[in-house]
Regions:
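Activation-segment/catalytic-loop signature of the eukaryotic protein kinase fold
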Residues: 77
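Conserved short submotifs of the Hanks-type protein kinase catalytic core
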Residues: 80-94, 98
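C-terminal lobe helix-coil module of Hanks-type protein kinase domains
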Residues: 131, 173-274
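Activation segment signature within eukaryotic-like protein kinase domains
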Residues: 113-114
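Protein kinase catalytic-loop region centered on the HRD/HxD motif
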Residues: 119-129
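Protein kinase glycine-rich loop
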Residues: 14-20, 25
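Activation segment of protein kinases
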Residues: 50, 143-186
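AlphaC helix of the eukaryotic protein kinase fold
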Residues: 43-65
Length: 321
């Protein structure tokens, strides 16, 4: 696709937003509804490969059926020079970009992001869908703080395995892949929760739980090694938050949270507790005599000055009378 090109006599390509392994994403204008949209199109070298075309079409169909505030909405699908689909245009950044641009993300923000991702995943899981590629690059944050899960291209439909998602296929991203995915085993709700656990781990510590020189070596670590406790890198981390993350990173799916909704509830509970502690500490500061003196002394001096100034002005006025 080219800048200025008109798709379906409706969508005008404005600019290239980015590209992934198999697709380009463009910003476009919907001429009928007078709004900006994003258009994802398959790269030309994949157009002749049936597996990738089916996977691309599958993403459009799957996401189109998920009408949820924490999932990017799909509006349209078609084939021009290449297959494409039209989706909601998000003003914001991926978590990958946010992580690279900020040294530390507040624990409250981490928990809020995690709760919103879990909310979106619950919507997918309730329809028998497993995302299979939860990672920072597939999570977007809007300027208002709303989280959007993207890229359902390798989604697995429970009880309906196709040739492109069947057991034995290793799909996912090495740093965030679940142990069962790394082995090519069947995926479940727990697989997405594990991947979300790796994302939360990275948001808190600055790095994924497992890293190595090659994707295969990284995936192997998910199978064979225990993650370091995140509190080793973030000493202010409350135990409840750490326990939740380590539970997500259990090697066996049954030892993780039972559902994304259960996880969401725990993350919000931990966030409320964290904010209560911060509020309590703030109230303690208000009762600290030293802090009180520090702020009230200048105010007292200013007040005395105003009184003396008023008195002096009044005195001069009386003299003139």
């Amino acid at each position: 696709m080219k800048i200025g090109q008109l798709i379906k006599e409706r969508y005008e390509i404005v600019e290239l937003l980015g590209e992934g392994g198999m697709a380009f994403v463009y910003k476009a204008k919907d001429m009928q509804l007078e709004r900006m949209v994003a258009i994802k199109t398959l790269k030309p070298n994949y157009v002749e490969q049936t597996t990738f075309v089916e996977r691309f079409k599958r993403e459009a169909q799957t996401a189109a059926n998920l009408n949820h505030p924490n999932i990017v909405q799909i509006f349209d699908w078609g084939i021009e020079e290449e297959p494409y689909f039209v989706m909601e245009y998000i003003e914001g950044n991926t978590l990958t970009s946010i992580i690279s641009n900020r040294k530390t993300i507040s624990l409250s923000d981490v928990l809020f992001i995690g709760a919103q991702v879990a909310n979106g995943l619950q919507a997918a899981h309730s329809q028998g869908l497993v995302h299979r590629d939860i990672k920072p690059g597939n999570i977007m944050i809007t300027p208002s703080g709303k989280v959007k899960v993207t890229d359902f291209g390798i989604v697995s439909i429970q009880d309906e395995e196709s040739d492109i998602t069947k057991t034995g296929s290793i799909l996912g991203t090495a740093s965030y892949i679940s142990p069962e995915q790394a082995q090519g085993k069947a995926v479940s709700v727990g697989s997405d929760l594990y991947s979300l656990g790796t994302v939360l781990y990275e948001l808190i510590t600055g790095s994924p739980p497992f890293e190595a020189d090659t994707p295969i070596a990284t995936a192997t670590k998910h199978l064979t090694e225990k993650p370091e406790k995140p509190s080793k890198y973030r000493q202010d981390l409350p135990r409840g938050i750490e326990n939740a993350i380590l539970k997500l990173l259990h090697k066996t799916p049954r030892d993780r949270f039972k559902s994304a909704e259960d996880l969401r509830a725990v993350l919000l509970q931990q966030r409320n507790q964290l904010e209560m502690v911060q509020t309590q500490e703030s109230l303690v500061d208000l009762t600290n005599p030293k802090i009180k003196y520090k702020f009230t002394l200048p105010a007292l001096i200013v007040s005395i000055g105003l009184v003396l100034g008023t008195f002096w002005t009044l005195s001069l006025s009386l003299i003139h009378i």
